C-alpha cells in the first residue's frame, strides 16, 4: 500500500492506510517482533559503540598506531559510530512504540545518517583493499604510500558517501520507512512521481555497490596472487608459508564479511525495485537490514581487533598500561617482517 510519503509492504484489502508516522504498525507483524527489533538494536548499541569508540581512543593514546595505513581503519570506526548513534538509537526508540514516531523530518535525518555510515563503511573497505594492493603488489614503481595518500583515501570515502546520501534529501529519490516501518532507507519500493527513483536506484547500485564490490575482488585477488608468488619463491621458509596462510585466511574473511554485510540487503532491495507490485512482507526487507546493521560489530572485529598491533594496544589500554597476555602474543605471533606478504596481514 503506497501513501504520499511511505510504503506499507502488504496488500491492503480494507482500503485503510495507516501512516507509519502516526499509528502503530502491529497489524504488519506480531508485536513481539517489534520488541525483538528493539532488543537487537540495544544489543548493537551496547557492543558497537564501546568497541568503535575504544578504537578511536586507543589510537589517540598510542602514537605508533597513528600511521597512514591505519587512517582508513579509523574512518571505518567513525562510520560505524555514525550508524550506531544516528541510526540504531532512533530505530530502537521507534520499535518501542511500534511505528516511526519521529515524523517525516526524523525519517530524513535517520535515513541520512544511517545510510551515510553504511556508505562510508562500504567505501572504506574498498579503499582499504586498494591501499593494501598498492603497498604489497606495487603496481606503481617507486611509489611510497604516505599521509597525503591516506587523507585522500579517507576524503574520497566521505565524498562518495555524500554523493549517495544527499540526493534523497534534495529530491532525487527520498527516504521512507522500510521493513517494519521503524527505520528509514532509500525508496526502492515506489516510482513516486517527481522523485526519479528509478534513475537513482540504478545509479546507486552501479556506482555504490557494483564498483566497490569489483574493487574489493580485484585488489584482494591480485594481492593473493602476489602472496602466493612470494611463498613459492621461498618454499623452504616456514615463516613465509605461515604468512601466506594468514594472509589468505584474512582475505577470505574480509570478502565474506563484505558479502554477508551487503549482499542480502542489496539483493532484496534490487528484487523489490525490479518487481514493484509484487507481494512481500515487512520481514522480507527487515531481516537483510539486520545483516547490514551488524557490520558495526563485525567490522571492528575483522579489521581492527584481529590486527595484532591494534589488539595489543587495546589490551594495554584496558589493563591500565599492562598487557597480561604479552607472553602469549609474542609466542603466537609470526615474524613475517622478512616477507613482503606480511605487510598486508591485518592479523
Curated annotation (Swiss-Prot):
Phosphorylated on some or all of the serine and threonine residues present in the C-terminal region. Contains one covalently linked retinal chromophore. A lipid is attached at residue 320 (S-palmitoyl cysteine). A motif ('Ionic lock' involved in activated form stabilization) lies at residues 131-133. The keyword Membrane applies. One of its GO terms (molecular function) is 11-cis retinal binding. It is a multi-pass membrane protein. Disulfide bonds join 107-184. Residues 326-347 are annotated as: Disordered. The modification N6-(retinylidene)lysine is found at residue 293. Glycans are attached at residues 12, 197. Keywords: Cell projection, Chromophore, Disulfide bond, G-protein coupled receptor, Glycoprotein, Lipoprotein, Membrane, Palmitate, Phosphoprotein, Photoreceptor protein, Receptor, Retinal protein, Sensory transduction, Transducer, Transmembrane, Transmembrane helix, Vision. The keyword Transcription regulation does not apply. The chain crosses the membrane at residues 34-58, 71-93, 108-130, 150-170, 200-221, 250-271, 284-305. Residues 333-347 have a biased composition (Low complexity). It comes from the Eukaryota. It is found in: Membrane; Cell projection, Cilium, Photoreceptor outer segment. Residues 59-70, 131-149, 222-249, 306-347 are cytoplasmic. It holds the Pfam family 7tm_1. GO terms for biological process: absorption of visible light; G protein-coupled opsin signaling pathway; visual perception. One of its GO terms (cellular component) is membrane. CDD domains: 7tmA_MWS_opsin. Photoreceptor required for image-forming vision at low light intensity. While most salt water fish species use retinal as chromophore, most freshwater fish use 3-dehydroretinal, or a mixture of retinal and 3-dehydroretinal. Light-induced isomerization of 11-cis to all-trans retinal triggers a conformational change that activates signaling via G-proteins. Subsequent receptor phosphorylation mediates displacement of the bound G-protein alpha subunit by arrestin and terminates signaling. Belongs to the G-protein coupled receptor 1 family. Opsin subfamily. This is Rhodopsin. It comes from Neoniphon aurolineatus.
Amino acid at each position: 500500500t503506497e501513501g504520499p510519503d511511505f510504503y506499507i509492504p502488504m496488500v491492503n484489502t480494507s482500503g485503510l492506510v495507516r501512516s507509519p508516522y502516526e499509528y502503530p504498525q502491529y497489524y504488519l507483524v506480531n508485536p513481539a517482533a517489534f520488541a525483538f527489533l528493539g532488543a537487537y538494536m540495544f544489543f548493537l548499541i551496547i557492543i558497537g559503540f564501546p568497541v568503535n569508540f575504544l578504537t578511536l581512543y586507543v589510537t589517540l593514546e598510542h602514537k605508533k598506531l597513528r600511521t597512514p595505513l591505519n587512517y582508513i581503519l579509523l574512518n571505518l570506526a567513525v562510520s560505524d559510530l555514525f550508524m550506531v548513534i544516528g541510526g540504531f538509537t532512533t530505530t530502537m526508540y521507534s520499535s518501542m512504540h511500534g511505528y516511526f514516531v519521529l515524523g517525516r523530518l526524523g525519517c530524513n535525518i535517520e535515513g541520512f545518517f544511517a545510510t551515510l555510515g553504511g556508505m562510508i563503511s562500504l567505501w572504506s573497505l574498498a579503499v582499504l583493499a586498494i591501499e593494501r594492493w598498492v603497498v604489497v603488489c606495487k603496481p606503481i614503481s617507486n611509489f611510497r604510500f604516505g599521509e597525503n595518500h591516506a587523507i585522500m583515501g579517507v576524503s574520497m570515502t566521505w565524498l562518495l558517501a555524500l554523493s549517495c546520501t544527499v540526493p534523497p534529501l534534495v529530491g532525487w529519490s527520498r527516504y521512507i520507512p522500510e521493513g517494519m516501518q521503524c527505520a528509514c532507507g532509500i525508496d526502492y519500493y515506489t516510482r513516486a512521481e517527481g522523485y526519479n527513483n528509478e534513475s537513482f536506484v540504478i545509479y546507486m547500485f552501479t556506482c555504490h555497490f557494483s564498483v566497490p564490490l569489483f574493487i574489493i575482488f580485484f585488489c584482494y585477488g591480485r594481492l593473493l596472487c602476489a602472496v602466493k608468488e612470494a611463498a613459492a619463491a621461498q618454499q623452504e621458509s616456514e615463516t613465509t608459508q605461515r604468512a601466506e596462510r594468514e594472509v589468505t585466511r584474512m582475505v577470505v574473511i574480509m570478502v565474506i564479511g563484505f558479502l554477508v554485510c551487503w549482499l542480502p540487503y542489496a539483493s532484496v532491495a534490487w528484487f523489490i525495485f525490479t518487481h514493484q507490485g509484487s507481494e512481500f512482507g515487512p520481514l522480507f526487507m527487515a531481516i537483510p537490514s539486520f545483516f547490514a546493521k551488524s557490520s558495526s560489530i563485525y567490522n571492528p572485529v575483522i579489521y581492527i581487533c584481529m590486527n595484532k598491533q591494534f589488539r595489543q594496544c587495546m589490551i594495554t589500554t584496558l589493563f591500565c598500561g599492562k598487557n597480561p597476555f604479552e607472553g602469549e602474543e609474542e609466542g603466537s605471533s609470526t615474524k613475517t617482517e622478512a616477507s613482503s606478504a606480511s605487510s598486508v596481514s591485518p592479523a
